[in-house]
């Protein structure tokens, strides 16, 4: 084996070291869904017409003279 042949034989090189795989970005935190819109209050019931608690007051009949007028 000549000196030149020995020179040519490169010692085995270790395979190139693969760079450590870069950690993938962590998943972004899930975005909170918009909170449910607060249910819109239905329009309040229109106020009920006041129920007359008492029957409407009938005007009292005009005063009648108790005594019939004296016939002259």
Swiss-Prot record:
Compositionally biased tracts (Pro residues): 33-47, 56-72
Ranges of the Sequence repeats in the UniProt entry: 21-29, 30-38, 39-47
Induction: During squamous differentiation of epidermal keratinocytes.
Domain of life of the organism encoding this protein: Eukaryota
GO terms under cellular component: cornified envelope; cytoplasm; cytosol
Pfam families linked: SPRR2 (PF14820)
Region (Disordered): 1-20, 33-72
GO terms under biological process: epidermis development; keratinization
Keywords annotated in UniProt: Cytoplasm, Keratinization, Repeat
Comp. bias (Low complexity): 1-11
Region ranges (3 X 9 AA tandem repeats of P-K-C-P-[EQ]-P-C-P-[PS]): 21-47
Record carries keyword Nuclease: no
Subcellular location: Cytoplasm
UniProt key word Chloroplast: no
Stated family: Belongs to the cornifin (SPRR) family.
Task performed by this protein: Cross-linked envelope protein of keratinocytes. It is a keratinocyte protein that first appears in the cell cytosol, but ultimately becomes cross-linked to membrane proteins by transglutaminase. All that results in the formation of an insoluble envelope beneath the plasma membrane.
Protein's name according to its UniProt entry: Small proline-rich protein 2D
Gene it is expressed from: SPRR2D
